From Swiss-Prot:
Its EC number is 6.1.1.11. Consists of two distinct domains, a catalytic core and a N-terminal extension that is involved in tRNA binding. Gene3D superfamilies: Bira Bifunctional Protein, Domain 2, Serine-tRNA synthetase, tRNA binding domain. Homodimer. The tRNA molecule binds across the dimer. One of its GO terms (molecular function) is ATP binding. This is Serine--tRNA ligase. It is found in: Cytoplasm. PANTHER family: SERYL-TRNA SYNTHETASE. Belongs to the class-II aminoacyl-tRNA synthetase family. Type-1 seryl-tRNA synthetase subfamily. The lineage of its organism: Archaea, Thermoproteota, Thermoprotei, Desulfurococcales, Desulfurococcaceae. Its main location: cytoplasm.
Length: 459
């Protein structure tokens, strides 16, 4: 049983350094991890030697008498004393080693574009016929033709209203001002038709994924520190998640976290894999690094609902499953009729857990750009090692770390922003995507065909 990153650290540390460099991280962490792991192994071997010596001496004592016996007893005590000291050192080394191993990022897949940030992300395909305001045509071409894609689009001569103004001024179905007063920035109140739309989106995603055999899960909304350490890179993301004061608990930022922990510390027979789950949960995020980006509206908020795909897989199957997960997300957005592109995320923008990541970005007509709606990652054995989740091979009962993968299906508030911008009419009416209508029909007060603007009062 071997963790891929530890194997590379021991056998080809210089190669592992190259992977760390691709992420634009300091490669010296590899040297420190290599040195500490080597010292830990040598100390472990020395402890085994000391124990063997002590056992040999202890077996000799009953056979001896007088001075010889006293000498052996003294030798045994000395060995025990040394053993105690070395075991203390080993414990310290184990803690240091684990911290260093946990700080190592995943191995970057060979198909990932190398670059320090999202400006190096590479679009790989487009879908749909975007509506492009005449003032954004050059901007649109910069996001399509620059990468060698000729995307058909519809020119409109009226500029669409941004989702924030649509929500609060045109439809009057949201209030971020009052939410800001009572909870702070990046919170919101949503009302009536938008709430129904939120629920319909979640039902739409769940209906599709459960029909494909995914097991529906309502997970815990909080996790212990030990578990969070296994799921994410806590050193990087500790300021992005909420901690419950006075408790060893953190609010989840996505259902991925509790779904990854669902089989923590388990050995799973290979014939049971893949295990496919679809989780639904609220998500809580500090958005500490967002600064002043997307302060208006509900695109980047502290809480939202999300349907998440999560799979436990055999290593040899995981790359095919990654394509399945992004394909599922594409199916949902095609059903909604929202134009999008799939982007291969650059190495410096991956985040420590992912070996490779795709984003699905929806076209936002009022902004004149594509924005992230879905994130799909193959984490390979990065989480499995930290949470000790292994698969058992039938031949020889060999245990090895399995692979975990995750992908957004629908993040409701972000998808609502895309609907408000893509399906608005010049008069402010928003057409409801046809695929959502059957999920809205169960509510007597829900909109079925369209959401209409509030009529302006006459003076």
């Amino acid at each position: 049983m071997s963790w891929s990153i530890l194997k590379l650290l021991r056998e080809k540390p210089e190669e592992l350094k190259e992977h760390v460099k691709k992420r634009f991280m300091d490669p010296s962490i590899v040297d420190e991890a290599y040195k500490t792991d080597l010292e830990w192994r040598r100390t472990l071997t020395y402890i085994q030697e000391l124990r063997h010596k002590h056992n040999v001496v202890s077996r000799e004592i009953p056979k001896l008498k007088g001075v010889d016996k006293e000498k052996k007893i003294k030798e045994a005590k000395q060995l025990l004393k040394e053993l105690e000291e070395v075991e203390k050192k080993l414990k310290e080394l184990e803690e240091k080693r684990q911290k260093l191993l946990f700080s190592l990022p995943n191995i970057v897949h060979e198909t990932v574009p190398v670059g320090p940030d999202d400006t190096y992300n590479v679009p790989i395909r487009f879908w749909g016929k975007p509506r492009v305001w005449k003032g954004f045509i050059d901007q649109f071409k910069e996001q399509t033709e620059k990468y060698g894609f000729k995307v058909e689009y519809e020119v409109i001569d009226w500029k669409p209203v941004g989702h924030a103004d649509m929500l609060e001024k045109v439809l009057r179905l949201g209030d971020t001002f009052k939410a800001g007063q009572v909870a702070g920035s990046r919170f919101y109140y949503l009302f009536n038709d938008i709430v129904f739309l939120d629920m319909a989106l979640l039902a739409y995603a769940i209906d599709y994924l459960t029909s494909k055999g995914y097991t529906l899960v309502l997970p815990p909304y909080m996790l212990r520190h030990k578990v969070m350490m296994g799921v994410i890179d806590m050193d990087t993301f500790k300021d992005a998640i909420y901690k419950i004061e006075g408790e060893d608990l953190y609010l989840i930022a996505t259902a991925e976290h509790p779904l990854a922990a669902l089989h923590a510390w388990e050995d799973i027979p290979e014939e049971e894999l893949p295990l496919k789950y679809v989780g639904i949960s609220p998500c809580f995020r500090k958005e500490a690094g967002a600064g002043n980006r997307d302060l208006k509206g509900i695109f980047r908020v502290h809480q939202f609902h999300k349907v998440e795909q999560f799979v436990y897989a055999k290593p040899e199957d995981s790359w095919d499953i990654m394509e399945e997960l992004i394909s599922n997300a594409e199916h949902l957005f095609r059903g909604l009729g929202i134009p999008y592109r799939i982007v291969n995320i650059a190495s410096g923008d991956l985040g420590a857990p992912a070996a490779k990541k795709y984003d699905l970005e929806a076209w936002m007509p009022a902004q004149g750009r594509y924005r992230e709606m879905v994130s799909c990652s193959n984490v390979t054995d990065w989480q499995a090692f930290r949470l000790r989740i292994r698969l058992i091979r039938r031949k020889g009962m060999v245990k090895e770390y399995l692979h975990t993968l995750n992908s957004t299906a629908i993040a409701s508030t972000r998808t609502i922003t895309a609907i408000l911008e893509n399906f608005q009419e010049p008069d402010g009416t928003v057409i409801v995507p046809k695929v959502l209508r059957k999920y809205l029909e169960v509510f007597k007060s829900a909109p079925i065909d369209a959401i209409h603007p509030v009529k302006k009062e006459k003076n």
